[in-house]
Amino acid sequence: METLSARFTVLQEKLMDIYESGVEDLDTQIQHWQLLRQEQIIYHYARRHGVTRLGYQPVPSLASSEAKAKDAISMVLLLESLKKSKYADEQWTLAQTSLEAVRSPPADCFKKGPKNIEVVFDGDPENLMSYTVWTYIYYLTDEDIWEKVEGHVDYTGAYYYEGKLKVYYLKFENDAKRYGVTGLWEVHVNKDTVFTPVTSSTPPVGDSTDSASRAALPEPSTSVSPERPPSQTARRYGRKASSPSTTSRRQRKGQRETTGTQRRRKSRSRSRSTNRGGRDTRRSSSRGSSVSPTRGRRRGGGDSRRRGPVTRSRSRSLSRASSAGGGISPDKVGTAVRSVGRQSGGRLTRLLADAADPPVILLRGDANTLKCYRYRFRKKHAGGFRFVSTTWSWIGDASNDRIGRSRMLLAFYSESQREKFIQTMKLPTGVEWSLGQFDDL
């Protein structure tokens, strides 16, 4: 063990010489990491043989020395590959080749020229975060070639280019969800505001160069869900929008309705002329419905001139009766305005379902747990829900302190879709859920 202690002392002296010399070349940095690897090997050997102290230095555990030895080996391999590049003759310091610097974002890259920037969340100067960005970044390509590029900052985060690919190594959106409420932030460089929110929406997560300007643009739909979402435009009498097929049928019926109205006007004029001639003692009805020529009986309806305008659904039924030349059966009443499938039950059930508010599920749990669950079920239940929110929290009326656990909402097109989702969902441990409805989304 005396020989082991002597070798350990020699290693310590060589490391001190490197630290005191301050040489800033790549060969010195490679030598530094090789000495650190040998130091951990001695620690590991001593621990295996029951030695707990080498001189005044305590011997770490086997797992610790093994992990640090592997880190030293990986650093030696990286530095030796960098030595073969055209950047080997540049100035390299101990800080630039440290394990912490290499593993900091962007990971497995060498960085130079650190700069501090500040991001203010929700426009509150007290709610800010400080980030370290880099002026120059050295990354290894797929062909094992080192490239040197400049680092950049925009509203979305800090990034650099790998060829034509824009790679973000910092995204402010993640911390905006954690520390903010509105999801907005400002980027300050050298105490100057260089990027401010342009819209009230959260910036996208994409890697395009115009990601900040695309925040206000709607994303086009690329897939058809099992149940089509209702139209967002306002409808008369609070009626919900129908499917596209129903809308096209209504357009065709509108044309027939115009023809039916002209026929009713001609029929009323012929009835008045007949009564004036004395050929018919019975007064002709001038009500909103027409007389069926085949059955000779009158449809019940109100006088449109005395009772006001006929509602849209009623005028549609009248126009259908006039254009067809007869009445319709009771089970066909209202079929043109149904927006729920025929398999949904009776007429009352369909009307209640048609007037129902959008159903939702509220999840409560840890923020990271909810985010991981959202990532999984968006792949597993694709098309099985309408919307899913980001994680959010309640705050009090007197402070911005968060109350309780994080929340997340799932919205659905119908009750049946929500029930189907509940039957197949598997929530993580510690996540609770409850049902609810909104007037609109």
Swiss-Prot record:
Polar residues: compositionally biased ranges: 220-234
Task of the protein: Plays a role in the initiation of viral DNA replication. A dimer of E2 interacts with a dimer of E1 in order to improve specificity of E1 DNA binding activity. Once the complex recognizes and binds DNA at specific sites, the E2 dimer is removed from DNA. E2 also regulates viral transcription through binding to the E2RE response element (5'-ACCNNNNNNGGT-3') present in multiple copies in the regulatory regions of the viral genome. Activates or represses transcription depending on E2RE's position with regards to proximal promoter elements including the TATA-box.
Primary gene name: E2
GO molecular function: DNA binding; DNA-binding transcription factor activity; nucleotide binding
Region: Transactivation domain, residue numbers: 1-201
Biased composition (Low complexity): 195-211
Name listed for the protein in its UniProt record: Regulatory protein E2
UniProt entry keywords in alphabetical sequence: Activator, DNA replication, DNA-binding, Early protein, Host nucleus, Phosphoprotein, Repressor, Transcription, Transcription regulation
Keyword DNA-binding appears in the UniProt entry: yes
SUPFAM superfamilies, per the entry: E2 regulatory, transactivation domain (SSF51332), Viral DNA-binding domain (SSF54957)
Stretches the record annotates as DNA-binding domain: 357-441
Family assignment from sequence similarity: Belongs to the papillomaviridae E2 protein family.
One Pfam family hit: PPV_E2_C
CC terms in the record's Gene Ontology section: host cell nucleus
Protein's cellular compartments: Host nucleus
HAMAP family the record matches: PPV_E2
PTM field: Phosphorylated.
InterPro entries: E2/EBNA1_C_sf, Nucleotide-bd_a/b_plait_sf, Papillomavirus_E2_C, PPV_E2_N, Reg_prot_E2, Regulatory_protein_E2_N, Regulatory_protein_E2_N_1, Regulatory_protein_E2_N_2
Compositional bias annotation for Basic residues: 262-273, 307-317
Biological process, per Gene Ontology: DNA replication; DNA-templated transcription; regulation of DNA replication; viral DNA genome replication
Subunit structure: Binds DNA as homodimer. Interacts with protein E1; this interaction greatly increases E1 DNA-binding activity. Interacts with protein L1; this interaction enhances E2-dependent replication and transcription activation. Interacts with protein L2; this interaction inhibits E2 transcriptional activity but not DNA replication function E2. Interacts with protein E7; this interaction inhibits E7 oncogenic activity. Interacts with host TAF1; this interaction modulates E2-dependent transcriptional regulation. Interacts with host BRD4; this interaction mediates E2 transcriptional activation function.
Disulfide-bonded cysteines: none
